[in-house]
Amino acid sequence: MSEKGRLFTSESVTEGHPDKICDAISDSVLDALLAQDPRSRVAVETLVTTGQVHVVGEVTTTAKEAFADITNTVRERILDIGYDSSDKGFDGASCGVNIGIGAQSPDIAQGVDTAHETRVEGAADPLDAQGAGDQGLMFGYAINDTPERMPLPIALAHRLSRRLTEVRKNGVLPYLRPDGKTQVTIEFEDDVPVRLDTVVISTQHAADIDLENTLTPDIREKVLNTVLNDLAHDTLDTSSTRLLVNPTGKFVVGGPMGDAGLTGRKIIVDTYGGWARHGGGAFSGKDPSKVDRSAAYAMRWVAKNIVAAGLAERVEVQVAYAIGKAAPVGLFIETFGTATVDPVKIEKIVPEVFDLRPGAIIRDLDLLRPIYAQTAAYGHFGRTDVELPWEQLNKVDDLKRAI
């Protein structure tokens, strides 16, 4: 049955949003530790509020210099985001920074360092030695909506957020401040995006800026129109798009002064904008022994290669783990009726082409590197501005041969 006039919405936030400040701090600390000790075990959570940053969690590492320098890492990242003055509501140079970090639980470390397969079953394969750092389920998704194989609503929302930051940092709109959000509502017919219905852009700004005469026309011209011109989507009608800029009428107080922020509170923004399911685990501040992060990246890698290989127009992949075990306990693949081959065959060949044990994921995606701070804002998937290993299409030929 034809389905017409359905509206689907996704949102993004800028790097100056309080929750994203926390993600950025947590991932900057992670990167600093991995740069000196690639085997660091890291689980760092951050809270920001007016004039204060609190960094807590568990870390086991030999990176003594990076560990001792966490306070400076925090300050540098806040300043890089753009909070460098009390006039903006937050200043990385003068805010209070409190560190409360302990060591990783030895009970967890035991299961990661010596997996059930090695400890109980006597497995000899080195990749069977590393167990999952926790139980859990992770999803990956890909679709042919965009060249980056992401759902169009979240892809467009991220482009708008990145552009909002770009015009602030390069001086095109110097009166903007770091905090901001975007939201995109798109009309779909039979799962095809046909019309951009509404765009909401809320951005922090200097106190003396007029909403109607300055901010709204500037955002339309320098942000929305620029992004839409670059998008050039084949089926999307943008001729009657409604733009709402700062619908409250004013957005001067922002950042940690406006709202407290926490690591891991933007997991839908980080992934597929609500278009695909989510296992519930956040990414930022976690080293790749945590399958919340590494397995979610692997599932995106699997899904994107399936779609790129022409085996389905869109696909969602789920994997599940037990803490302390290397082999997944479950794998589920949904093609939503778009598969070009028997879906059972796809589910059969995925474990043959992709080794989904945590140690193998870390090896194949080269995850023991300081690459995570760049993922803290604007999404972890489908990025067009940075190269990420889980976005590579290096398994397409293997999938075609296996099928």
From Swiss-Prot:
E.C. number: 2.5.1.6
Compartment(s) where it occurs, according to its Swiss-Prot or TrEMBL record: Cytoplasm
Domain of life, per lineage: Bacteria
A Gene Ontology BP annotation from the UniProt entry: one-carbon metabolic process
Uppermost EC category: transferase
Cofactor(s) it depends on: Mg(2+); K(+)
Major localization listed first in the record, in broad terms: cytoplasm
Molecular function terms, GO-annotated: ATP binding; magnesium ion binding; methionine adenosyltransferase activity
CDD domains documented for this protein: S-AdoMet_synt (cd18079)
Catalysed transformations (reactions): L-methionine + ATP + H2O = S-adenosyl-L-methionine + phosphate + diphosphate
Binding site for ATP: 17, 179-181, 250-251, 259, 265-266, 282, 286
Residues that bind Mg(2+): 19
GO CC terms, sorted: cytoplasm
Cofactor binding: number and manner: Binds 2 divalent ions per subunit. Binds 1 potassium ion per subunit.
Region entry Flexible loop, spans: 104-114
Entry binding sites for K(+): 45
InterPro entries assigned to the protein according to its UniProt record, in alphabetical order: ADOMET_SYNTHASE_CS, S-AdoMet_synt_C, S-AdoMet_synt_central, S-AdoMet_synt_N, S-AdoMet_synthetase, S-AdoMet_synthetase_sfam
Entry function: Catalyzes the formation of S-adenosylmethionine (AdoMet) from methionine and ATP. The overall synthetic reaction is composed of two sequential steps, AdoMet formation and the subsequent tripolyphosphate hydrolysis which occurs prior to release of AdoMet from the enzyme.
Subunit structure: Homotetramer; dimer of dimers.
Family statement: Belongs to the AdoMet synthase family.
Protein name: S-adenosylmethionine synthase
Organism: Mycobacterium avium (strain 104)
Encoding gene, per UniProt annotation: metK
